[in-house]
Amino acid sequence: MIARFAPALAAVSPALHTALAPLLDHHAFAGWLSAPQVKELMQAGGLDEDALCFTLLPLAAAYAVTPLSHFNVGAIACGISGNLYFGANMEFLAAPLQQTVHAEQSAIAHAWLRGEKRLRALTVNYTPCGHCRQFMNELNSGTDLIICLPERSAATLASYLPDAFGPRDLAIQSLLLDEIDHAFAAAAWLDHDLSAPSPDDNDPLVSTALDAASRSHAPYSQSHSGVALQTQDGCVYAGRYAENAAFNPSLPPLQTALILMNAAGADDRQIRRAVLAERQNAPITQWPATNATLAALGCHEVHHLSLSL
């Protein structure tokens, strides 16, 4: 069993422990629970879904990477599919604070990358900050999203973000978690003084980055982008750009890829190479921040691919 789960698992009821431990122990566990698994755990613990999420919050918080604040926040996104997705805050040494990921962003991005279509609720162990409330308002569930906090009655996002400004005010039709595929194609490599050759078209890192960019959410700037990361063991993780109506709460594609890596139990210091794919001649670029943050994590083979329709 992964050691980081041990303290949280020790606090659950014996019946729930018996049902939960084998799931966490499985080599393929990657920070989310399928609807059948959720039902099994609810029955074992005699809990409804919201109560189960509160019980599981310490497991989500165990994913936190907090070398700066040492303040661990966990969140669980509840999809309409019945699946549950863990998220936690992530901080990166030697990178700007703006690269930090909040737990709520982590859980939402995790659900998005796993193919969830809509969220019913978000359970979190601390009150969401204003940044996260604005990020949540980009979702296709909008202000109907239910926020669940310990020792408080569940309430909608509308109650936490009154008089909200969001994509609907800008007549944006495509919302975060809506299914979309822009079908971008590779245009040209923009590799910057790399000694390593650019990947060929059959490289899974290229196809993964292309697909991620095609499914990214950038309705304001049209600067769609995606990232693919390959670790030392050969595993590949995708990340998509999630733009926000308020701009600043936008989540870069590198961060969403790191969220997926963290959920899978991978070490972000083991990234061997990466590809950033972004739209040709777009008004903004993810390149400087992506390259700098990956360098801080010890990855120096970062390829830059421009895209066309």
UniProtKB/Swiss-Prot annotation:
Active site (UniProt): 104
GO annotation, biological process: cytidine deamination
EC number, as in UniProt: 3.5.4.5
Cofactor note: Binds 1 zinc ion.
Residue span, CMP/dCMP-type deaminase domain: 48-168, 200-309
Keywords: Hydrolase, Metal-binding, Zinc
Stated role: This enzyme scavenges exogenous and endogenous cytidine and 2'-deoxycytidine for UMP synthesis.
Designated name of the protein: Cytidine deaminase
Gene behind the chain: cdd
